[in-house]
Amino acid sequence: MAKRDYYEVLGVKKDADEREIKKAYKRLAVKYHPDRNQDENDTGENFKEVKEAYEILTDPQKRAAYDQYGHAAFEQGGMGGGGFGGGGADFTDIFGDVFGDIFGGGRRQRASRGSDLRYNMDLTLEEAVRGVTKEIRIPTLNECDVCHGSGAKPGSSPVTCSTCRGAGQVHMRQGFFTVQQACPTCHGSGQIIKDPCNKCHGHGRVEKSKTLSVKIPAGVDTGDRIRLSGEGEAGEHGAPAGDLYVQVQVKAHPIFEREGNNLYCEVPINFAMAALGGEIEVPTLDGRVKLKVPAETQTGKLFRMRGKGVKSVRGGSQGDLLCRVVVETPVHLSEKQKQLLRELEESFVGAAGEKNSPRSKSFLDGVKKFFDDLTR
């Protein structure tokens, strides 16, 4: 039976880029993979066809040859008839590169750098503003202290792979081309551990918790990240370790809210002080300070206290503290207080009292005009 066009197999156009081809392959590979496909009539040929098309169209040289010669470019001792045996590329190498995370596979590479780790650290506002040093304990993969990362039992050493002679790669003939792939014997490492370490069982790494002292600079905020170089997981077989990233989260404060380098707080005052003015104490992160409240202050008035905010983590400028005044309505009044308020209320009646509440007069005038317009 004639082989189908590779572009048709993947359902992409002839000018499709590599991203489109990989996307199509991923979708079809999941659909036809033997571990997931429950169709009894499917013998696996669909999956082989998709895999073959993907390998050709993601290799620039092979794709160029296919575009020029079609299937004939690969019919001489390579992939004729759609097979991947003999001189063909190993299935796990092709499929594992892209989808090892889906099916749990993926080939081993040369000794690689250790994985990065992340640690979420909660801080109080005071700690974030002033800076702090904290000890943290993290579980990670550390270099084996018996074999020192080699994976081999002390007194022995890994030996050079006889298949690839230490290169970690082998060359295979495919049609007009010679392709390179990971050595199937050593899985790309170039070495074989014949006598593995008893502690790490040849992995070169062991699970272990470690304690670190982390210095948090002054001025950090939620979302900031601190990098500790080389404090991540140990690399494979002596490769460099990854990094540890400390992710900062600042907890809510009962008094202050932070926006950038500025701090905000609400300051309640009684209506007598709002009307007559006076002096109050307000909190800052450095202690209490005096704030003068002018007469006739209204709710929502902002008072800026320069330099009482947060110093920038990058140095230099320092934010401000902004105090928002809230005029508080008195509660639990005594009879004497109620009587005094009634007398005050009576003084506001009539034209003489209009100047005491200009916003109220303006509002009432607006309401009156609104209803007058409705009745015209």
Swiss-Prot record:
Positions annotated to bind Zn(2+) 2: 161, 164, 183, 186
Pfam families found in the cross-reference section: DnaJ, DnaJ_C, DnaJ_CXXCXGXG
Binding note for cofactor: Binds 2 Zn(2+) ions per monomer.
InterPro entries: DnaJ, DnaJ_C, DnaJ_domain, DnaJ_domain_CS, HSP40/DnaJ_pept-bd, HSP_DnaJ_Cys-rich_dom, HSP_DnaJ_Cys-rich_dom_sf, J_dom_sf
Cofactor annotation: Zn(2+)
Residue stretches making up the J domain: 5-70
Zn finger (CR-type) location: 131-209
Signal peptide: none
Keywords (A to Z) from UniProt: Chaperone, Cytoplasm, DNA replication, Metal-binding, Repeat, Stress response, Zinc, Zinc-finger
GO terms of molecular function: ATP binding; heat shock protein binding; unfolded protein binding; zinc ion binding
GO CC entries: cytoplasm
Subcellular location: Cytoplasm
Binding site for Zn(2+) 1: 144, 147, 197, 200
Start and stop residues of the CXXCXGXG motif repeats: 144-151, 161-168, 183-190, 197-204
BP-aspect Gene Ontology terms: chaperone cofactor-dependent protein refolding; DNA replication; protein refolding; response to heat
Chief subcellular location: cytoplasm
Domain notes: The J domain is necessary and sufficient to stimulate DnaK ATPase activity. Zinc center 1 plays an important role in the autonomous, DnaK-independent chaperone activity of DnaJ. Zinc center 2 is essential for interaction with DnaK and for DnaJ activity.
Functional summary from the UniProt entry: Participates actively in the response to hyperosmotic and heat shock by preventing the aggregation of stress-denatured proteins and by disaggregating proteins, also in an autonomous, DnaK-independent fashion. Unfolded proteins bind initially to DnaJ; upon interaction with the DnaJ-bound protein, DnaK hydrolyzes its bound ATP, resulting in the formation of a stable complex. GrpE releases ADP from DnaK; ATP binding to DnaK triggers the release of the substrate protein, thus completing the reaction cycle.
Quaternary structure note: Homodimer.
Homology family: Belongs to the DnaJ family.
Protein name (record): Chaperone protein DnaJ
Species name: Yersinia enterocolitica serotype O:8 / biotype 1B (strain NCTC 13174 / 8081)
